[in-house]
Amino acid sequence: QDDAYFIPAGAIHAIGKGILIAEIQQTSDITYRVFDWNRVDKNGKSRELHTELAVDAINFAPDQHYDITHQPEVNRSVNLVECPYFTTNVVEVKGELTRSYEALDSFVIYMVLDGDLTMKWKDGSEKATKGETVLVPACIDEMTLEGNAKLLEIFID
């Protein structure tokens, strides 16, 4: 729980059975499967592997460290990842926190990791609880988060 990793393109990775993750990634319609755990599709056929294509895309550099050390701070946004494709922060709300998006030319996505809260903006509000995801449109300049919750905050910078 609460582990964070930044796995750049070209790094072979796998997700084990029973793991729940938030996989935030750049826009892409490409996945190269080098192994598929002997799974089959809805017709009982093995899914296609892309081993030859993958070899050209894999980063074989040794000693790559992907884990992100972070310590959430109450009513603050703590950066986890900032890259050319997206920014991801963790936000722990206790009580009330106002977030300004005026300098941001992007939507914001909040994923509720724990707890529940109410998101309030000039023309409305929305409640969210653990496991839910909320898309905040780019036209909202400011939002107040009220409650007790831990969130992922994702946007394009």
Sequence positions of predicted segments:
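Ligand-binding loop in jelly-roll beta-barrel domains
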Residues: G10-I30, A138-D157
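Glycine- and acidic-residue-biased ligand/ion/polar-headgroup-sensing regions
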Residues: V93-D123, G131
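Conserved hydrophobic/aromatic beta-strand scaffold that supports enzyme active sites
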Residues: A4-F6, I12, I21-E23, T88-V90, ...
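Non-heme Fe(II)/2-oxoglutarate
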Residues: K17-L20, Q26-G44, Y110, G131, ...
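C-terminal amphipathic alpha-helical segment
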Residues: Y32-L104
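Short acidic-glycine-tyrosine-enriched beta hairpin
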Residues: Q1-F6, W121-I140
